[in-house]
């Protein structure tokens, strides 16, 4: 299928561009959930690369006593169910308020910041490398972040 081949070529190209930036001295590359999220919020991300095989969830927990909120990433719903996290303000156990996949969370933030999003399959060597070596979350930056 020609369209599928074009998608695969585009995916390989964008992952290779990320890897090229990664090895440069002041390269425009960022990876890992926390670092990419920070760069995304700053508006520094040009292209966000996300593995289609990301299964983590982004949850918002709220304190029933003081109303304080915390965002937490969990690997699975069962991990979230077991979470007994105390509120950093008053010590009360936080309750789950809302939930979405990590992919949905990142795509929303990318759209807010006018960053391009590339969902990368694990059908290619580059796609597997993105998932295994970089946790499935990477970015090509608009400018160098010091």
Each predicted region: which residue ranges?
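Terminal alpha-helical anchor/extension segments at protein ends
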Residues: 1-146
